[in-house]
Amino acid sequence: MTALTKLFHKLLLLEVFFMENKTQTSNHQHQSKWTLRNIILIALIAIFCGIIFWGIGFLYTALTVALTPIGAAPFANDILMGLWCMAGPLTGFLIRTAGSAFLGEFLGAAVEVFLGGQWGAGAFISGLVQGVGSELGFTLTGYKRYDWVSLNASILTTVIVTFAWDMYKNGYNKFALPLLIGLFVTRYISTFIFGGILTKMIVKLLDRSNAFSL
């Protein structure tokens, strides 16, 4: 993850090089208008996360194989869900514009598709569902604050929406209640770590390096 974070840092430095004017925002401000700078940054995040999504496919396969002998194969999906959903919170927290969390997640999934991800075009649907889940969290706070409150709201709505989708898509509705609870808690922890803690770490890294003014 360190190498990927450095890559993202370099991409942002390129973005800053081409965009001279910066807009200062605080933890409780948002940008109401779309700018070329926002679009470029979303594209960079989508590429960064799309590469991660593509790589997770291999990790998912290996983890599923490892967990199958102990009857815990379904947990592979939920253990890695936070990584699959990190583009939404990261984009929403950096761009701070309505719709940015959804676009970041969906476009990240699109990059995964074009890289030849193992789920093919089905990743578009997953990206759409995950994007909606992430966006809802920022909607609940009215796009008026960007701190742990909005980030946790995004994490919670992402977990709820994606879990509801998996009840239909992956047959979670056939699982026993104790297993469902275990999967839900696992998904929440994963999303909190990668969509919450890692997002804040990346934001702080960029803030310290002055690559992006927050």
Language-model-detected regions and their locations in the chain:
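N-terminal amphipathic/basic-hydrophobic helices that include classical n-h-c signal peptides
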Residues: 1-18
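Hydrophobic transmembrane alpha-helices
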Residues: 15, 20-91, 204
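Short helix-perturbing small/polar motifs within transmembrane alpha-helices
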Residues: 21-23, 38-46, 125-166
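Hydrophobic alpha-helical transmembrane segments
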Residues: 39-44, 82, 86, 102-103, ...
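Alpha-helical transmembrane segments of multipass membrane proteins
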Residues: 45-53, 87-88, 108, 112, ...
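Interfacial aromatic-anchored transmembrane helix boundaries in multi-pass membrane proteins
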Residues: 57, 108-136, 169
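Membrane-helix interface "capping/anchor" motifs
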Residues: 92-103, 140-149
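Terminal transmembrane helical module of multi-pass membrane proteins
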Residues: 154-214
